[in-house]
Regions:
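N-terminal nucleic-acid-engaging modules of covalent nucleotidyltransferase systems
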Residues: 1-183, 190
Length: 192
């Protein structure tokens, strides 16, 4: 009689999702989510730091029926002070600041006067059906003012969401967001 040994299943201890300070920046939450390896852990991290601002950004980014009224691409703005220091669009400057912060692995949370947690209620102004009476110039000016007040990494996220390109930088998919916000299996199939 021969006995076959069953392979031992080794389970790796699940690493806990790191804690963030109260009211974290959106980029901090997305960085924590990005570090998770499995979809289940990413969804768990998103649930842990769930906030209406994240939901609004995910809807704008992943819902095809939400149409941005802002022009796609770079945000074409620079103040006189910025032009004296360097040239380029606001998007370029935000990207440069963001990459410098990532390169130095430092985050100065004092940069920016506001956060997406506070400003998300104004996002309706930038999508079709939100505030259609607003003229294009005023809409773009409002968007630029919000970007200038945000932390550069949050501003970069808002620029990505405007163009529905959040998934190009962060490992977050539409199906992952559906898993996060659907309550039953019937709703899950409609996310497809």
């Amino acid at each position: 009689m021969t006995t076959t040994k069953k392979p031992k299943k080794t389970t790796r201890a699940s690493t806990p999702i790191e804690d963030l300070p109260p009211n974290p920046f959106v980029f901090e939450v997305l960085n924590v989510v990005n570090k998770q390896r499995s979809t289940a852990k990413k969804v768990e991290a998103l649930k842990k730091f769930e906030h209406d601002s994240l939901k609004a950004l995910f809807i704008w980014n992943f819902d095809e029926t939400v149409i941005s009224l802002l022009p796609p691409g770079e945000v074409p703005y620079s103040s006189l002070k910025d032009e004296q220091n360097s040239s380029g669009t606001l998007s370029t400057k935000i990207g440069q600041q963001a990459s410098t912060m990532r390169f130095n692995d430092t985050v100065n949370t004092n940069q920016g006067f506001t956060t997406l947690r506070r400003e998300w209620t104004k996002l309706y102004n930038f999508i079709k059906g939100g505030n259609d009476k607003l003229n294009g110039l005023r809409r773009e000016t409002m968007f630029i003012q919000i970007l200038q007040g945000l932390h550069p990494l949050d501003a970069e996220i808002l620029c990505l969401v405007k163009d529905k390109e959040l998934q190009k930088k962060y490992k977050i998919t539409r199906s992952m967001v559906c898993l996060l916000y659907t309550s039953d299996a019937a709703d899950e199939h409609s996310c497809g």
